[in-house]
Amino acid sequence: MKTVFSPAASAALIFGAATLAGWPVRAEPNRVTFPENLDQLVHYTTVRRGNVTEHMLTSPEAIAAVKDGKPVPNGTHFVLADHRDGKLYRYFVMQKGDGWDADYDDRRRTGNWQFQWFWPDKTINLNENTNRCQSCHRSQAGSEYLYTGYRLPRFSGTPIE
């Protein structure tokens, strides 16, 4: 049996495939939650890049674990509060959970860490590509996938810049 598509159906199929091939990747559902205890997290370092100021926060337990040479505990949040021109623009949240690495294939694994972007109102920023976060943070495997992890042992109560 021969299947024949009408010219309109063929055009729709080709247009649809072309559109999807160029469709931008968006945030994906994952296990990351916005920390309910944001006000209890410790601001341990600040990074400044032009008009962007990034405040990094985490739990006292995570700081103590790193200082003791132990792994960051499961359940830990690391939060980057991204300020642009002095105003909160968005949050980047890394969260660690037991077995979370199994959610991704080997090319995307970052230990048991998952990543999510949030708007200032704490809703998920669906315009961000969390695969990009995983890709960059994979280079930091030796420091729990944290770019600022090396600053934690030096933290003594005042944010390090």
Where are the regions that the model predicts?
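A generic membrane alpha-helix/interface feature
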Residues: 1, 20-21, 155
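Bacterial N-terminal signal peptides that target proteins for export
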Residues: 1-12
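Short, structured coil/loop segments at alpha-helix boundaries
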Residues: 2, 59-60, 160
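Intrinsically disordered and other compositionally biased segments
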Residues: 6-7, 18, 118
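Bacterial N-terminal signal peptides
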Residues: 10-21
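Sec/Tat signal peptide C-region and signal peptidase I cleavage site
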Residues: 23-27
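Sequence context surrounding c-type heme c attachment/ligation sites in exported
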Residues: 28-51, 66-161
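Short, structured beta-strand/loop micro-motifs enriched in basic residues and often containing a Trp
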Residues: 53-63
